[in-house]
From Swiss-Prot:
Protein name, per record: 26S proteasome non-ATPase regulatory subunit 11
Annotated SUPFAM superfamilies: TPR-like, Winged helix' DNA-binding domain
One example of a Gene Ontology biological process annotation: proteasome assembly
Subunit structure: Component of the 19S proteasome regulatory particle complex. The 26S proteasome consists of a 20S core particle (CP) and two 19S regulatory subunits (RP). The regulatory particle is made of a lid composed of 9 subunits including PSMD11, a base containing 6 ATPases and few additional components.
GO cellular component entries: cytosol; nucleus; proteasome accessory complex
Protein's UniProt keywords contain Cytoplasm: yes
Amino acid sequence: MAAAAVIEFQRAQEMLVSDRAASIDILQSIVKRDIQESDEEALRVKEQSILELGGLLAKTGQAAELGGLLKYVRPFLNSISKAKAARLVRSLLDLFLDMEAATGQEVELCLECIEWAKAEKRTFLRQALEARLVSLYFDTKRYQEALQLGSQLLRELKKMDDKALLVEVQLLESKTYHALSNLPKARAALTSARTTANAIYCPPKLQAALDMQSGIIHAAEEKDWKTAYSYFYEAFEGNDSIDSPKAITALKYMLLCKIMLNTPEDVQALVSGKLALRYAGRQTEALKCVAQASKNRSLANFEKALTDYKAELRDDPIISTHLAKLYDNLLEQNLIRVIEPFSRVQIDHISSLIKLPKPEVERKLSQMILDKKFHGILDQGEGVLIIFDEPPVDKTYEAALETIQNMSKVVDSLYNKAKKLT
């Protein structure tokens, strides 16, 4: 029995490249076969077949079949050791969730696996699955549920010795707080994660995720683009070394840093580099177009890039947030350049020069006046902008302070002399 299964398994592996469908059929027949619990070789082959079949179903995009496999193998898990069963469940669930197939069954399947782990009293497996559920809640923007389950899980993990899982949950907590714009708590959770990570060996995937989040926090909270760039570079190298699809995201954030540092000319050099060359495509092209628009101070090109590459730019919340700020700066620079020669100018004329709708130009000009970017008023009755000369700086306050300081020195000097005489 076991010998026949071994031969079939080997045949399935040989057919992986030439005929995947036939390979899947063979593996399914091995998985569905009933075996004796005492036959260790047959158990080993069935376990390998389940993992191989799961990998194949993930590669061929058969999400529903993979979800079905995860449910089907549960009775078999009682025949193998707890450690092997935990590895099998985690591997299959990770394969299913990493597909990002959006079947709508992800949370339900994850909850089913957690209930099974609870019923079987497998605490470590339950905690690992709950950490995956926190990640799933975060991905589906169910932030409150993610925080609630995450804080409950953190209390448990701090009493136990699974530091790698603790880092993972702390990192997810930081991401969730960042998504909710609670930057102080996001930074605190990240600091806790990095402190815990320093005490253990971090797998490349987890280390890359830590570096990525560190870069995001530095960019969001402190606008420290140089430090953020170095973190994104580490994250890119880490993800690239394990062929993770997140490498392209890290590369995009590196290019964003160069644009925000006002060195858009470095973007082309980065994209043409040896490491980044394999990631050439729409993702990098989008940032190249933004860099070119930023270099030329062209609002029209900037808006064209945002329209042409909507999925790559607007749908990424990190890039979208910072590009909105960049667009704002570009608009201000263009408006100041346009109004500079005038003391009184029609808003319609500014709108036609800058090729933007009049209400948007009006709104931005009024904001700039309030922020004291220039001195002027908007006469909406006549539809004109009146610009005043820069008022001379009143130095009375500075002169008064200087006089008081000098008087203080004189009084101190006289006091010291009088003290010596007495």
